[in-house]
Design a protein with these regions (language model features):
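Canonical Rossmann dinucleotide-binding motif of NAD(H)/NADP(H)-dependent dehydrogenases/reductases
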Residues: 2-33
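Conserved glycine-rich Rossmann-like NAD(P)H-binding loop of the short-chain dehydrogenase/reductase
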Residues: 30-45
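The beta1-alpha1 cofactor-binding region of Rossmann-like NAD(H)/NADP(H)-dependent oxidoreductases
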Residues: 40, 57-67, 98
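Conserved mid-core segment of classical short-chain dehydrogenase/reductases
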Residues: 66, 88-102, 145-148
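Residue(s) in the substrate-gating loop at a strand-loop-helix junction
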Residues: 136
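C-terminal helical subdomain
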Residues: 176, 192-229
Length: 258
């Protein structure tokens, strides 16, 4: 799908990847990009910058998401692209609190479910639409020291696969973005999934995302090395797990020495 003349909603749009994508799509001729963020001031600032609507919204609140889509469709037009990008890091393993696990589940899984529920009926009726989920390389591989994050990002990828299987023949495109480290506010908190192959800039990720949806490519990998790691994991899971245990041990040694 080309973004030209399209109406898009971008969550997590107040900064980082989201704001970079919003700017890129407007520069590419989008009709409108609605910028959504839980930080209303940030959303409105980006919206003002690109000449579009900026909205404060909690993506884990289904009623708010549904109301936004209804508003956009009434005031601007049908939503062509929903970039479900909001996310946050969380450390810990199975010992992390139930509240921490649930918060990550709501943000990294249910927020995408709510977005899909809100836009899919209209998209399917038109036979045209695109969903993009921001997951993480941690969802394809793992993140040392961040179980709630990597587990819920893995679920995000499976949800995207499920929607693509169910609605690919209905004219619905689906992509899932799986970066390693990106130079955003989250970068200092990225544990184990961001430093191996370098930190990339949000503007670069925006270009990669735009090209992927233009080509209808499901898996978006701003760090191409991730594909190699996924193939190695699939070829020999036991060897991969041993390697991850070594990585964890090195990480713990570094933490103890700091």
């Amino acid at each position: 799908m080309d973004v030209k003349d399209r109406v898009a909603i971008v969550t997590g749009g107040g900064g980082g990847i989201g704001s970079a994508v919003a700017r890129r799509w407007m520069a590419g001729g989008a009709r409108a990009v609605v910028v959504v963020d839980r930080n209303g001031d940030a959303a409105r600032a980006v919206g003002t910058e690109i000449g579009c609507l900026g909205v404060e919204l909690d993506v884990t609140n289904e009623a708010e998401v549904a109301a936004l889509v209804e508003r956009v469709e009434g005031e601007i037009g049908p939503v062509d692209i929903f970039f479900s990008n909001a996310g946050a890091g969380a450390g810990g393993g199975v010992e992390a609190s139930n509240e921490a696990w649930q918060a990550q589940w709501e943000l990294h899984v249910m927020a995408h479910v709510y977005a899909a529920r809100a836009v899919l009926p209209s998209m399917v009726a038109r036979g045209d639409g695109y969903l993009v989920h921001t997951a993480s390389a941690a969802g394809l591989l793992a993140a040392v020291g961040s179980a709630p994050y990597s587990v819920t990002k893995a679920a995000c990828i499976k949800l995207a696969e499920t929607i693509a299987i169910a609605h690919g023949d209905d004219g619905i495109g689906v992509s899932v973005l799986c970066p390693q480290g990106v130079n955003t506010a989250m970068a200092p908190r990225q544990l184990g999934d961001g430093g191996t192959d370098g930190i990339v800039e949000p503007d670069y990720v925006a270009e990669v995302v735009t090209a992927a949806i233009r080509d209808g490519r499901f898996l978006i990998l701003p760090h191409p090395e991730v594909q190699t790691y996924v193939e190695r994991k699939a070829a020999d899971p036991d060897r991969w797990l041993k390697g991850m245990r070594r990585l964890r041990a090195r990480s713990l040694d570094l933490q103890e020495g700091s």
